[in-house]
């Protein structure tokens, strides 16, 4: 029924019951999960998570997240390149720019973020891989960098920008990740934007264990998981006046096209 294009399934939050989380997702129609990295010290854990036998297809992506810029070292970029060259990574990610927190706006760390992003975009070009992009308070800067270092394709994770920014990303060959924000009553601008975009402009994502759907949070939930993608599907279906099945199938087609995922068996 659906592919979760962004879930940190390797996270320690899932250590106690990862198999049960996967089973619940599979029971609700999730057919595959893209698992992006964020720090070099998690690369091995992520690789092992995606390699273990599972009810679902698990696809790894490797990258250095901008929020951890202070911890990233030059050798981590080399480690990333080794993984891209020797594993079945489907994307470079989660990478990007973040100016949301005050410390990330420090001139030295901001420059380092840009340098790391440029290096990782170059790796994506070298290995002909799409990218999974993170941006907070930095859409304009990210668009500018992408115009200089054009990726082959990719996803703008958790998009919540303006209409002109959405079209700028689409013009660069990217699509927009739609997650739990779409379920929030305050997300009217995002819903209005999605109504005005082509039907192949977005993919679905949980961002689990983060970004809880509004209904789950209101009910006292504290950990997101891929099965909750159903809430995002329902909210987007209502927004677009389409059926949930149509939304899930359209998103799966777009995810497979953008990330060039292998075909799934009908039984999966």
Can you describe what each PLM-predicted range is?
Residues 1-268:
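Mid-domain alpha/beta scaffold segments of enzyme catalytic cores
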């Amino acid at each position: 029924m659906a592919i979760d294009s962004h879930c940190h399934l390797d996270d320690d939050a899932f250590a106690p019951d990862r198999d049960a989380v996967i089973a619940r997702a599979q029971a609700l129609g999730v057919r595959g999960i893209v698992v992006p990295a964020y720090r070099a010290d998690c690369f091995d854990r992520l690789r092992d998570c995606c390699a273990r036998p599972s009810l679902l297809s698990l696809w790894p992506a490797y990258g250095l997240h901008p929020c951890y810029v202070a911890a990233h070292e030059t050798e981590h970029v080399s480690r990333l390149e080794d993984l891209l060259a020797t594993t079945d990574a489907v994307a470079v990610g989660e990478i990007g720019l973040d100016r949301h927190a005050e410390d990330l706006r420090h001139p030295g760390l901001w420059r380092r973020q840009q340098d790391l992003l440029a290096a990782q975009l170059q790796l994506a070009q070298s290995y002909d891989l799409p990218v999974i992009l993170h941006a907070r308070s930095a859409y304009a800067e990210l668009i500018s960098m992408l115009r200089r270092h054009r990726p082959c394709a990719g996803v703008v994770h958790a998009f919540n920008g303006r209409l002109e920014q959405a079209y700028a990303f689409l013009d660069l060959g990217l699509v927009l990740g739609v997650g739990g924000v779409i379920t929030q009553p305050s997300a009217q601008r995002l819903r209005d934007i999605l109504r005005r975009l082509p039907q192949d402009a977005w993919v679905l994502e949980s961002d689990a264990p983060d970004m809880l759907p509004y209904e789950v949070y209101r009910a006292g939930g504290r950990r997101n998981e891929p099965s909750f993608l159903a809430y995002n599907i329902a909210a987007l279906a209502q927004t677009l006046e389409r059926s949930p099945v149509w939304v899930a199938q359209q998103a799966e087609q777009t995810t497979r096209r953008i990330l060039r995922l292998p075909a799934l068996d009908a039984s999966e």
